[in-house]
Each structure stands twice: as structure tokens, then as C-alpha cells.
Amino acid sequence: MYVPGSLWTAARHNIPLLAVMHNNRGYHQEVMHVQRMSNFRNRVASLGNDMGPIGTSIANPDIEYEKLAQSMGWWAKGPIKDPSELSPALKEAVAAVKAGEPALVNVWTQPR
């Protein structure tokens, strides 16, 4: 969850940027690395099996990044869970950026 400082900086300095968040609700890069290394070393490391859970999950509760962004003056939309909602949200976000404000679109993706 490295987002808050970036949101604040863009708001503070009036930077009209578009942030499309790939929200997999965790740091799954580390999960994949641990799984890859455990396979290489012939060990069992999978989510919830023998060795226990691996990786960092940022869920339950899920962070509402769009509300965090809005609290700092951003235009924000999300969470986008249905792919059919993405195009309209991006069009609205681009319009907000063209109007001079930062915009965030929180897009939920598969946790991997």
C-alpha cells in the first residue's frame, strides 16, 4: 500500500495525472517468487498448504483506494470489478485530467 504519499503529492502540487490501479489486493509478486523458489528447491509452498500462507494479502478489509484519493481532492472511481465498466470509467477519468485534476481508477484484478 504505497499509494497515500503519491496521492497527497499529486494533490498538493496540482498534478493532473491519471492513475489506473492494478489492484490485486496483495503483493503477489512475492507470492510468485516464493512459489518459484520453493519449486526450485523441491519444497512445498503454496497458499495455505503445508507451510502455511505465503505472501502479503491486503484484503479483508479491502482498501477503498478511490475513497482515499477522493479524500485528497482527486476524481476517483472504483472498485471496477466488471470489465464492461472499465472503458466508461477511463473516459470519465481522462476528462477529469483534461480539466486539470488528478484521477484514479481502482481496477480489481485476479490475485496473482
Where are each of the predicted segments found?
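Thiamine diphosphate
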Residues: 1-111
